[in-house]
Amino acid sequence: MLTAIIDYESGNLHSAEKAFQRMARETGAGEVVVTSDADLVARADRLVLPGDGAFPACAAELRGHKGLYDAMVEAVEQKGRPFLGICVGMQLMATTGHEYEETPGLGWVAGDVVRITPENAALKVPHMGWNDLVIEAAHPIFDGIAGGDHVYFVHSYHFRVTNPTERLAHVDYGGPVTAVVGRDTMVGLQFHPEKSQAIGLRMIGNFLTWTP
């Protein structure tokens, strides 16, 4: 089994690579590679799309790596490969992003990415630090995870999901902020699992052993 972490020049992937490789060893999930090789992405059994920075910049970088982008889309849309989006990689699953300008996303989960606007003016943006998960729907990504378990966030924009059944978990930050989305063979995490200690590692392991 091969898991490809897609490298499209959007952030340092070292900590994510180490976390995924550790959990692949612990779960017997095979090999994990960081790659910008379209052929390797096409052959991978599951895909991970990270992302740090602004939505339009990440979208442009991803689409700018055309062979890589096409291989990823074909693997997910036509071959049904399990897919995990992390942070901006999760946001790119949306229909549209509204950071600085309107930017089309992948359109895999209907909704848009908008600035966080806490009802409590004392809450600062970006939303940075630990927050407690409110799980809204059962999903294999939550195996061994309980409501109230905390994970680590750093973001100023969040995914406003159109279909409530595709928002799998949220956190409270002056109102609900989407934490996990998913449908079919796709799941996305707004938080950084590689920075979320035991809970994040457990979710990485859950993805690596998920057979949708």
From Swiss-Prot:
Q: Which residues cross the membrane?
A: none
- Determine if Lyase is one of this entry's keywords: yes
Q: Please state where this protein is localized.
A: Cytoplasm
Q: Give the matching InterPro entries.
A: Class_I_gatase-like, GATASE, Imidazole-glycPsynth_HisH
Superkingdom to which the source organism belongs: Bacteria
Per the record, the major location class is cytoplasm
Domain Glutamine amidotransferase type-1 intervals: 2-212
The GO terms this record gives for MF are:
glutaminase activity; imidazoleglycerol-phosphate synthase activity; lyase activity
Q: Does the keyword Hydrolase apply?
A: yes
Question: Can you state the subunit structure given in the record?
Answer: Heterodimer of HisH and HisF.
List the protein's name.
Answer: Imidazole glycerol phosphate synthase subunit HisH
Organism of origin is Ruegeria pomeroyi (strain ATCC 700808 / DSM 15171 / DSS-3)
